[in-house]
Curated annotation (Swiss-Prot):
Residues 1249-1383 are annotated as: N-terminal hotdog fold. Residues 1404-1558 are annotated as: C-terminal hotdog fold. The keyword Methyltransferase applies. It comes from Talaromyces marneffei (strain ATCC 18224 / CBS 334.59 / QM 7333). InterPro entries: Ac_transferase_dom_sf, ACP-like_sf, Acyl_transferase_dom, Acyl_Trfase/lysoPLipase, Ketoacyl_synth_AS, Ketoacyl_synth_C, Ketoacyl_synth_N, Malonyl_transacylase_ACP-bd. Non-reducing polyketide synthase; part of the gene cluster that mediates the biosynthesis of mitorubrinol and mitorubrinic acid, two virulence factors that improve T.marneffei intracellular survival in macrophages. The two polyketide synthases pks12 and pks11 are probably responsible for sequential use in the biosynthesis of mitorubrinol and mitorubrinic acid. The first part of the biosynthesis is probably catalyzed by pks12, which synthesized orsellinic acid. This tetraketide is then used as a starter unit for pks11, which possesses a SAT domain, in the second part of the biosynthesis. PROSITE patterns: CARRIER, KS3_1, KS3_2, PKS_MFAS_DH. This is Non-reducing polyketide synthase pks12. Residues 1249-1558 are annotated as: Product template (PT) domain. Multidomain protein; including a starter unit:ACP transacylase (SAT) that selects the starter unit; a ketosynthase (KS) that catalyzes repeated decarboxylative condensation to elongate the polyketide backbone; a malonyl-CoA:ACP transacylase (MAT) that selects and transfers the extender unit malonyl-CoA; a product template (PT) domain that controls the immediate cyclization regioselectivity of the reactive polyketide backbone; and an acyl-carrier protein (ACP) that serves as the tether of the growing and completed polyketide via its phosphopantetheinyl arm. The release of the polyketide chain from the non-reducing polyketide synthase is mediated by the thioesterase (TE) domain localized at the C-ter of the protein. SUPFAM superfamilies: ACP-like (SSF47336), FabD/lysophospholipase-like (SSF52151), Probable ACP-binding domain of malonyl-CoA ACP transacylase (SSF55048), Thiolase-like (SSF53901).
């Protein structure tokens, strides 16, 4: 066989090659038909495919074997070798070993089969015939001697083997008979009976070399393997022979009966799994996937599918090369953080949901931005008709009107005048920086050199602000330069801050500018991106007129139907830094900018047309910077606006640089604009966000809406360009994309963004947590923080959703939350070991803790030797690498010093007899724990040790080096072991005073010493065994000492006594040789007097003293307590008595935190460390066991152990700050129309009597163009309304329940869309304002304004008097929407067990209906028609489970169409449960009640209240106390079968005194005839801005004149709605809200906050300002007393008080409906100054953001945050509110609140 050695050499060279062989060389030998090549290659290929398959599926060999337990691993012909290797292996290692044997067998089989073959004769030795009938193959073979049937694939597919020339003749004959004949790529006589003798010879060879050639026996088979000869299972055979024998005989000499094998398999599958009829074949090999005919299985009615492994692996697992750091350009820039707001997406994660679904966010223009019907521009002139008909489209962000002004320290008033672009930039800047980890250590005062570059152009909000009078905030809020300046100012940066305007390319140009600034050293870090928020209409008109905008809706990039772009909102910012710095800092690198640049298309045919040559040049430039070849760019994110001119030009540029027939893979192209529109100046950054999302998920999304290629664009496929139409894997060896963006003025920008470099991760960090897989139970400390509890819960909820969906590692989540996110004052901590426990913990968060502003001092406490074991739990040593390092380090030093190892001893549970091992081991454990805490970042203020522990403390504080300390401990222990006397000494701890202790010693009269003075009543005695026994006897028998607690100290020797003296001389010699240093941490020695501090605080003599003299531990603790104040006493080590000893020694234990670590006798000792971390966090300490215990030494490379990952951004608590656009021309037209109407030019329609309506709600009017603006009438005279309201009496006043408003809204929505009834119904932000009763003299209206989403409205319920058209009273507001079905299964599973726990809890209290409603009657009296609670079970005043039934007395439902899905009665009974829970709790005093004031969210679905079978529900309610007067409730409603149909979250209750509530309800007049409202005293000139952006609390007062004691008629307010009560009782906790107080005549001055001193000051001020003689000693305890005294004097001295000639309007409303409380400010009005002060505080709050409750009279305006701009605005506000004028010198930052009050009061009386 001359060819044999040559073929083997080919294999050797191929396997050994360090470089790939040339293609021609490889093709030469792999094309050879020789079995010596084909069979080994087949074995290699199939084994490799097998491992690729396992890797792709992320399963193990044993898991796969279990999956194929029935079907097994079967091999056809040569495939039997790898099949046997796999089937006989228990794990991957055995597969590799057996594959090696199979490979040798394959080579040998090929060699034996080719014996005597002439390689010079070309052609195969095997041919496959597709015969026409059974037996035809036998007929043909009989005609050609020397040929044999080698394999039967199926009855008609037969393989024939024979000599080359004979086989060729046979093939020609068969084809002549019309039979298809296929040559096999194989030479050699396989499956040939002529080989029987050769086969025996081969088998003998195998026996000679069993380790190389013998596979395991059939007994080793882990799954089914069948014989190619018989088709039967080999596993069931009795043979003990090697599988190699079976393979050799089948392959060399026997016919392959494959079809029989399949028949046997089908029979067994049918018999074994009769219930499972579907099976899959995983097919490995070269492409002969037709070798598994389905006929045998179909006969058994089995359904077979085939999985081509080659295709499967290629599809799922393209080899990922990745790149190491050194393979990136030297100046590459890392993207380490990102924040975005794009239509429908508030984060990159939400953006991916839109991209992957290929969805579009286009919609018609939102009326909330501006109402086109009110816009005058374009309404006249030649284009008026066209403008009126044109439909405007856009892609909009939600809630741009709102902003978390408190979070950013901006006053509400200033926020209202800020362009929403500035506000959103602040939010996204925070998110990008927080995600990058920058904010974790950021301090504004550091003046960091960080750059800020913003791409922006439009300032459309200027159209809104220009509708109002100018303010000091308008310029700073709308000038473009402040978009970057605002960010830099907020964070206190010194780096360059620039706004860049290049039109649509601006944001990517800003990124280029940032990259260049970092690369040039101008700044080490930068924030870059862009913004575009649509708030004005004029750009729509201008761009539309210029032909830019699509008339049909969304952008359609590259599509035949492209007709222009669709405008969009968008904001995006990325945090950038040098790639090498980012990797060094352990940042989460989201993507790498490998090349970036800009240029200009100055030679374009028109200024708005892109120039292809400029784009080509730019692409080549950035490609060259990246160091990549064009073929390595596999995705291009195009500008792609969807224009007929721009798209073809851009494609041609891409084709020129990145396309070409020589590419090895397609380059996909897309454009974000197809999903979210064209965000103009933010378009480029939006495209970059898309690429970052693609890199994160490793997929390429479809181009949304793409149908057919624009005919102007030549075919893409010839140049390997492709537009994806479905979601696909990004299967490139290195993922890199080009992002392109060009501006309408010719400015181009592009960049290359690649994936992050490979960072080698450490995989042996925690042996118990192999590779950190979440299957382990290692606990991780969780840390979540926010500025308040609302955002804390929102952050937790968002994080839980993300974790459930994305399944990150718990370790990475915990690490990122603590190490890479900013810490806020409200914090929550918890533990989790897996995702389930993580989500469970997050879902349970109710409120956080406010960390102490000044954390306590930390003291490390080291115990003495209190036992004869060390007690290190082995799990600590195994699980905490850094702890292990320090113990190992100590052990190495001990061994180096010549002593035995300490490692067995540290774990021992039995007493350690070797004193050296005991004490060195104790030292090592204490030292390791202390060092780990210090490495964790714990700031230790002092260390103290008891007895032996002081030696460890010396090492930890670096008083002694570690080696010196261990030398001392080991040598000392050796002396103890060798030099100690015969009496070891015994120690006894007693709890007695020093006098009692000394008395005991005197009575015993033995040589007993006090070894330890541990505290005032804690001492340790030392003596001989006999003498200590006498002490114990004395205490037990002598009545003087009986009851004195005592216990033996389990120490090896009696230290601090005369027993130590034999070792002292040599110990002193040792000490003198040690080097003592000044401690790096203050060391408090346990001495009677403190050791003088100095360069060497501890002298060598201390060592002998320490051993011989007593331990004055109590004195040391007292000194520390006096010096440091409240402390955290932390044990160094575990399971020692040190912390209880410290606690007993402190004078005031309640001031301290005692943190002892108990690991013994608990189920999970390793939980002690993360639990201790939580305690330290709760105390405000900055400490991380990630850096300490969990990390590897010496530098704690946690970045390679715990990954900094992307997590959902901070959830802001936004409130509305918005100036609505007003067209001044339109407003003027309205004024003219009103004047004409007043002059009689417009007739009036006489009121006609109306017949009672048939329905509760009827349509009244709607917008002429759409259903976006609707008005309905709510008919309060219907029987349904009156019956329900009459049944719902709050303190005997019939009031409309909240659920009635909801039913009316749903009924109205049904008129718009009948399908509302089968959808999920959602109510948000319900607020209840003016109460609504039964009053037939009032018109009740329902207004519904569309908010831009389909079937979503903002609604208002209000009423006006029928006779007088005064100001309407608002009763309720909220948002209603119809949504798709929501999956409640998670809630159902979570709450089912919780409800059962409450029902069976021993502390639960169960109330039946009668008792429940009796309790409730103090708040609400319910008639039978509203009594649905049959029983309720309450636990701890916080949880309740109630059974609710349909009330027995029914209410008419014929007047409503919404009863089935939103029944007022049923919903009210649900809400009653949470109301009863809250009002029956101990937090509600008997003279006060909790009233519902709003609901955050209600979701209902699958409700059918009209079905008689649905008459019982189970309601779970829980209450959370927000403050003393504010409680929030949540409720969940389940059907009888456990289905969740209703959720209500954030039901807000506020507490009111019953007397006050009754007086208010009596005064509101909603159940009686209305009074005439007060009109405004003056008419404003022009249009003024809203006075406040705060929450609106109305005092809709009807005024009446009442005589005072002087006969004067004074105007007083008698009607107040419920929201006024909220303002008084709960709003004081809202920094931006009103702080108005109800001051009644019977109000006590003390309750108003006036103590004896302030009352004296108050009276003196009144006397000085009003000229009244009021004695400070007079009893003026109530307002009435003060009022009477004032008027008694003023009736004779102040004639002006008899005239109401100066009325001040004090505005208490927000922007939507200014309402005035008209109060005469005169010297005779006793309450005027208080009202003026209150209003002054409100104005200061509006302009500073400071809470009213924190503003004191003596503070200046500057002290409360008023700056040079806001003082101008504040001055104008004062002048408007109080009708006074200030000179410039009168109003400045120096003024105090008291001075302002005095000024206004004096001015008012002039």
């Amino acid at each position: 066989m001359t060819q044999g050695p040559r073929y083997i050499r080919h294999f050797h060279d191929w396997i050994a090659a360090t470089e790939s062989p040339s293609t021609s060389t490889e093709m030469q030998w792999t094309d050879t038909m020789s079995g010596m090549i084909s069979l080994p290659l087949l074995t290699i290929m199939q084994i490799v495919q097998y491992f690729q398959y396992l890797e792709t599926r992320e399963i193990t060999h044993s898991q796969f074997v279990e999956e194929i337990r029935i079907g097994g691993a079967q091999g056809y012909c040569g495939g039997l070798l790898p099949a046997a290797a796999i089937a006989a292996s228990r794990n991957e290692d055995e597969v590799v070993h057996n594959a090696g044997i199979a490979l040798r067998l394959a080579l040998a089989i090929g060699a034996y089969a080719e014996l005597g073959d002439d390689e010079n004769i070309p052609g195969p030795t095997t041919v496959v015939l597709r015969t026409k009938y059974s037996g035809q193959a036998e007929e043909i073979v009989s005609k050609f001697p020397g040929t044999y049937i080698s394999a039967i694939t199926d009855p008609e597919t037969i393989s024939i083997v024979g000599p080359v020339n004979v086989v060729e003749e046979l093939r020609a004959y068969a084809e002549g008979q019309g039979i298809k004949a296929t040559k096999l790529h194989l030479r050699g006589k396989v499956h040939n009976p002529e080989n029987k003798d050769l086969c025996k010879e081969f088998i003998n060879l195998c026996h000679k070399y069993p380790s190389m050639l013998m596979l395991p026996t059939a007994a080793s088979l882990q799954t089914s393997l069948r014989s190619n000869k018989t088709g039967k299972e080999l596993r069931s055979s009795a043979t003990t022979a090697s599988l190699s024998i079976e393979v050799l005989e089948n392959t060399l000499a026997n016919k392959c009966e494959w079809y029989n094998l399949l028949n046997g398999m089908a029979k067994d599958l049918d018999a074994i799994s009769r219930t499972e009829k579907e099976h899959t074949f995983a097919l490995f090999g070269t492409g002969r996937k037709n070798c598994v005919p389905t006929m045998p299985f179909e006969e058994k009615q089995l359904r077979i599918s085939k999985l081509d492994i080659v295709t499967y692996v290629e599809k799922h697992d393209i080899p990922r090369e990745g790149r190491t750091l050194d393979q990136y350009p030297e100046n590459a820039i890392a993207i380490v953080g990102a924040g975005c707001r794009l239509p429908g997406a508030n984060s990159i994660d939400e953006l991916w949901e839109i991209l992957s679904a290929g969805s579009s966010r286009v919609e018609k223009l939102r009326s909330s931005r501006f109402d086109l019907s009110t816009v005058s521009r374009g309404s006249v002139g030649p284009d008026a008709k066209q403008t009126a008909k044109r439909e405007l489209y856009g892609n909009f962000l939600d809630d741009v009107e709102s902003f978390d002004s408190n979070f950013f320290g901006i006053s509400p008033r200033e926020a209202m005048y800020m362009d929403p672009q500035q506000r959103l930039l602040l939010e996204t800047a925070y998110e990008a920086l927080d995600g990058s980890g920058y904010l974790r250590t950021h301090r504004r005062g550091d003046f960091d050199n960080v750059g800020c570059f913003i791409g922006a152009s439009y300032t459309e909000y200027l159209e809104n602000t220009s509708s109002y009078n100018p303010t000091a905030y308008t310029a700073t809020g709308t000038i473009r330069a402040f978009q970057s300046g605002r960010i830099s100012y907020h964070f206190g940066w010194s780096g360059p801050s620039e706004v860049i305007d290049t039109a649509c390319s601006a944001s990517l140009v800003a990124v280029n500018r940032a990259c260049k600034a970092i690369q040039s050293g101008e700044c080490p870090m930068a924030l870059a991106g862009g913004v575009n928020i649509i708030t004005g209409v004029n750009n729509y008109f201008d761009l539309g007129k210029a032909g830019f905008l699509s008339t049909t809706g969304q952008c359609k990039p590259f599509d035949e139907t492209a007709d222009g772009y669709c405008r969009a909102d968008g904001v995006g910012l990325v945090a950038l830094k040098s790639l090498r710095q980012a990797v060094a800092d352990g940042n989460n690198v989201m993507g790498v900018i490998m090349g970036v640049g800009t240029n200009q298309g100055g030679l374009s045919p028109a200024i708005t047309v892109p120039y292809y040559r400029a784009q080509i040049s730019l692409f080549k430039n950035v490609l060259n910077q990246s160091g990549l070849k064009s073929g390595q760019i596999s995705y291009v994110e195009a500008h792609g606006t969807g224009t007929q001119v721009g798209d073809p030009i851009e494609i041609s540029s891409v084709r020129e640089v990145f396309g070409g027939s020589d590419r090895s893979e397609f380059v996909n192209m897309g454009s974000l604009k197809a999903n979210v529109g064209h965000s103009e100046t933010a378009a480029g950054i939006g495209s970059l966000m898309k690429v970052l999302a693609m890199l994160k998920h490793g997929k390429i999304p479809p181009l949304a809406g793409f149908k057919s290629l624009n005919p102007k664009i030549p075919a893409l496929e010839p140049d390997y360009l492709r537009i994806p139409t479905e979601l696909q894997d990004w299967n490139s060896s290195f993922r890199a994309a080009c992002v392109n963006s060009y501006g309408a003025a010719g400015s181009n920008s592009a960049l290359i963004c690649g994936e992050a470099p490979i960072v080698t991760a450490m995989t042996d960090v925690l042996p118990t947590d192999t590779n950190m897989h979440e299957t382990s139970h290692l606990q991780y400390p969780l840390f979540l923080s926010a500025t308040n509890n609302f955002t804390l819960k929102a952050n937790a909820s968002k994080l839980a959703q993300y974790v459930l969906k994305n399944q990150p590692r718990v370790a990475d989540v915990a690490y990122t939350l603590y190490h890479r996110r900013k810490h806020h004052r409200v914090q929550w901590t918890g533990l989790a070991h897996d995702l389930e426990s993580l989500v469970r913990s997050l879902d349970k968060i109710e409120e956080g803790l406010e960390v102490p502003a000044s954390p306590k001092s930390v003291v490390l406490a080291f115990s003495g030797q209190s036992k004869q074991t060390i007690g290190l739990d082995p799990s600590w040593y195994v699980s905490f690498p850094r702890l292990r390092h320090y113990i190992d380090l100590c052990n190495k030093i001990v061994i180096r010093l010549g002593y035995s190892t300490i490692l067995p001893a540290v774990f021992a549970t039995d007493p350690v007899e070797d004193v050296v091992a005991l004490q060195c081991g104790t030292f090592a454990f204490q030292y390791a724990c202390a060092k780990c805490w210090i490495d964790s970042g714990l700031e230790v203020k002092a260390a103290v040790g008891h007895s032996f522990g002081e030696l460890t403390a010396m090492a930890v504080t670096e008083t002694l080096s570690l080696e010196d300390a261990l030398h001392l401990v080991a040598a000392r222990a050796t002396l103890v072991q060798t030099k100690w006397g015969s009496e070891r000494g015994t120690m006894l701890a007693i709890e007695a005073t020093l006098d009692t202790t000394r008395q005991i010693i005197t009575v015993v009269n033995e040589n007993i010493e006090i070894a330890c003075y541990n505290g005032q009543k804690s001492h340790v005695l030392v003596g001989t065994e006999r003498s200590i026994g006498q002490v114990e006897h004395l205490i037990a028998t002598d009545n003087r000492f009986k009851g004195t607690r005592n216990t033996r100290v389990k120490t090896s020797h009696g230290f601090h006594s005369v027993f130590t003296e034999p070792i002292l001389p040599e110990l002193d010699e040792i000490a003198q040789k040690l080097e003592f240093n000044a401690p790096s941490i203050p060391l408090e020695t346990s001495t009677e007097k403190p050791i003088n501090e100095g360069e060497h605080a501890v002298e060598p003599s201390r060592i002998v003293q320490h051993t011989r003299t007593p331990v004055y531990f109590g004195d040391a603790i007292s000194r520390l307590e006096e010096r440091l104040g409240p402390c955290i006493w932390l044990e160094a080590g575990s399971d020692s008595p040190i912390i209880p000893m410290v606690k007993r020694a402190t004078h005031n234990p309640s001031q301290h935190t005692f943190l002892g670590l108990k690991a013994k006798d608990i189920a999970r000792p390793i939980d002690v460390i993360p639990q201790a971390s939580l305690t330290l966090w709760q105390e405000g300490m900055s400490v991380s066991c990630f850096d300490g215990f969990y990390s590897h030494p010496p530098n704690g490379v946690t970045s390679n152990v715990f990954n900094h990952i992307w997590l959902p951004p901070y959830q802001f608590q936004r409130t509305r700050h918005w100036l609505q656009y007003m067209d001044l021309v339109t407003e003027e037209r309205k004024t003219v129309d009103e004047r004409l109407r007043s002059a009689g030019a417009v007739g009036t329609i006489a009121s006609q009597p109306q017949t009672p309506p048939l329905k509760l709600v009827t349509a009244r009017s709607r917008d002429s163009e759409s259903w976006s603006s609707l008005e309905f009438a709510i008919h309060s005279e219907t029987s349904r309304f009156t019956d329900i309201v009459s049944a719902h009496a709050v303190r005997d006043q019939p009031l409309c329940p909240a659920s009635m408003y909801m039913e009316c809204v749903v009924m109205a929505a049904q008129m718009v869309e009948p399908s509302v009834s089968v959808k999920s119904l959602s109510f948000q932000n319900l607020s209840f304002q003016g109460a609504l009763g039964i009053n037939y003299n009032r018109d009740v209206s329902l207004l519904m304004e569309g908010d831009g989403e389909y079937l979503a409205w903002n609604f208002t319920v209000r009423s006006t008097g029928k006779e007088s058209k005064g100001r309407p009273t608002t009763h309720a507001k909220g948002r209603f929407s119809v949504t798709s079905h929501i999956d409640f299964q998670l809630y159902e599973r979570m709450l089912a067990d919780r409800m059962n726990e409450i029902l069976v809890h021993p502390q639960s209290e169960r109330l039946m209906a009668g008792r429940a409603y009796t309790l409730f009657s103090r708040v609400v009296n319910y008639a039978e028609s509203l009594r649905g609670i049959s029983e309720i079970t309450i636990l701890n005043n916080r949880h309740a489970v109630a059974e609710v039934c349909r009330p027995k007395v029914s209410v008419s439902s014929s007047e409503s169409t919404a009863v089935a899905v939103c029944d007022t009665v049923t919903l009210d009974t649900f809400i009653q449960v949470v109301g009863l829970l809250i009002n029956s709790s101990e937090t509600c005093p008997v003279d006060e009640v909790f009233i519902a004031t709003g609901i955050d969210s209600i979701i209902m679905q699958d409700c059918d209240f009209s079905d008689p079978q649905h008459d019982t529900w189970k309601v779970y309610a829980m209450a959370t106390t927000r403050s003393e007067s504010h409680v929030a409730g949540d409720m969940f409603v389940f059907t009888k079968d456990g289905k969740l149909i209703f959720t209500g979250s954030g039901v807000q209750f506020s507490r009111f005194p019953i007397a006050k509530l009754e007086k208010v309800l009596e005064g509101i007049g909603m159940n009686s005839a209305p009074r005439s409202p007060i009109g405004n005293d003056g008419i404003g000139k022009g249009v003024t801005a809203p006075p406040s952006p705060t929450t609106q609390f109305h005092m809709n007062g009807h005024a009446k004149s009442t005589p005072n004691r002087h006969g004067l008629r004074v105007r007083t307010t008698v009607e107040m709605d419920e929201q006024t009560l909220v303002a008084q009782d709960s709003v004081s906790r809202r920094p931006s809200a009103l702080k108005s107080a109800m001051i009644r005549n019977d109000s006590n001055l003390g309750t108003l906050g006036l103590d004896s001193l302030s009352k004296l000051e108050f009276v003196n001020q009144l006397r000085a300002q009003l000229g009244n003689e009021i004695s400070p000693t007079q009893d003026l305890s109530q307002i009435a007393d003060l009022y009477n005294k004032l008027f008694a004097h003023s009736s004779t001295t102040n004639s002006r008080s008899a005239h109401i000639d100066h009325v001040h309007k004090i505005e208490l409303d927000g922007p939507s409906s200014p309402t005035a409380v008209n109060s005469p400010v005169t010297a005779g009005d006793s309450q005027s100054k208080l009202r003026i002060r209150q209003r002054i505080l409100e104005l200061i709050t509006e302009n500073s953001g400071e809470s009213v409750s924190t503003i004191k009279d003596e503070v200046s305006l500057q002290d409360v945050g008023i700056d040079s701009l806001s003082v101008i605005e504040l001055k104008e506000s004062f002048e408007d509110a109080f009708s006074v004028q200030f000179g410039d010198w009168d109003f400045g930052l120096h003024l105090t609140v008291r001075e302002l009050v005095d000024y206004v009061v004096i001015s008012s009386n002039v």
